[in-house]
């Protein structure tokens, strides 16, 4: 716990500094990875797009998806949905970084006093709780980003899109499905966010003081690689939940919907096989570079601005 003399940093409370630093680094890294992000979403949700008549045939992998998307829509189309993603990701990641330390303080476990296992469990719990809390505020933006990214402009459809932008997604969804349409898939999202964010933050905070020591301490490359490994593992562990929630999102505005997340799991596995739950996972691993960048850039900003005196965020 910080004492009273350490409550102000650059004239701002640590909570505010944490919020701003986390959000800025997240927005920059997500914009850089936007093309990978969209390809991942297209491959992941292609079966729902085919059922809705918005895609004429399946993609034969990440390379084929990239080739067809740029041919049909142009290079800049790889950033479609990025505006919504930045708007969504700024508060999401910023709130994650900010609230995680609040939750961590609530658990109050110390590695030297309570042991490594309990300290690590506290990190996992605080990371998961922070992610689930922030999800309540930004879920509809995640929904809108998903619909925009999967709004393919296929040659067969004459180039017509379903949505004309972020506001149009909200307008059409509210008209067809009401508020429920904006929150379809929220259940598996909560489960997925706890698994992913819990590992994303918890494992990074727990492993970092063990691995990034000696010559590796404050090393950008080592911090980046550790962050990439953590995001990759967390992403694979939670990927089936991510697939189900996004497939449920894609049914808003459609005549046929999944009855529940369990029904979605059952139907996808029965009709497409278990491997369909992992479609786009390869692109998701590449996308992990963005998440790793968030953590490592955040740590470097702490070193430059606070000389590691401030221990918010991933510190």
UniProtKB/Swiss-Prot annotation:
Family from the record: Belongs to the mitochondrial carrier (TC 2.A.29) family.
Short motif Nucleotide carrier signature motif, span: 245-250
One Pfam family per UniProt: Mito_carr
Result of altering residue 30 to A: Abolished ADP:ATP antiporter activity. Decreased bongkrekic acid-binding
Transmembrane segment boundaries: 14-37, 81-104, 116-145, 185-213, 217-242, 284-304
PANTHER family, A to Z: ADP,ATP CARRIER PROTEIN 1-RELATED-RELATED (PTHR45635), ADP_ATP TRANSLOCASE (PTHR45635:SF14)
Record-given protein name: ADP/ATP translocase
Binding-site list for bongkrekate: 30, 88-89, 96, 196-197
Lineage: Eukaryota, Fungi, Dikarya, Ascomycota, Pezizomycotina
Impact after mutating residue 246 to A: Abolished ADP:ATP antiporter activity
CC per GO annotation: mitochondrial inner membrane
Binding site for ADP: 88, 245
Free-text function comment from the UniProt entry: ADP:ATP antiporter that mediates import of ADP into the mitochondrial matrix for ATP synthesis, and export of ATP out to fuel the cell. Cycles between the cytoplasmic-open state (c-state) and the matrix-open state (m-state): operates by the alternating access mechanism with a single substrate-binding site intermittently exposed to either the cytosolic (c-state) or matrix (m-state) side of the inner mitochondrial membrane.
Keyword Cell membrane on entry: no
UniProt cross-references to SUPFAM superfamilies, sorted A to Z: Mitochondrial carrier
Annotated control of activity: The matrix-open state (m-state) is inhibited by the membrane-permeable bongkrekic acid (BKA). The cytoplasmic-open state (c-state) is inhibited by the membrane-impermeable toxic inhibitor carboxyatractyloside (CATR).
Documented effect of changing residue 193 to A: Strongly decreased ADP:ATP antiporter activity. Decreased bongkrekic acid-binding
Organism: Thermothelomyces thermophilus (strain ATCC 42464 / BCRC 31852 / DSM 1799)
Mitochondrial matrix membrane side: 38-80, 146-184, 243-283
Keywords in alphabetical order: Antiport, Membrane, Mitochondrion, Mitochondrion inner membrane, Repeat, Transmembrane, Transmembrane helix, Transport
Quaternary structure note: Monomer.
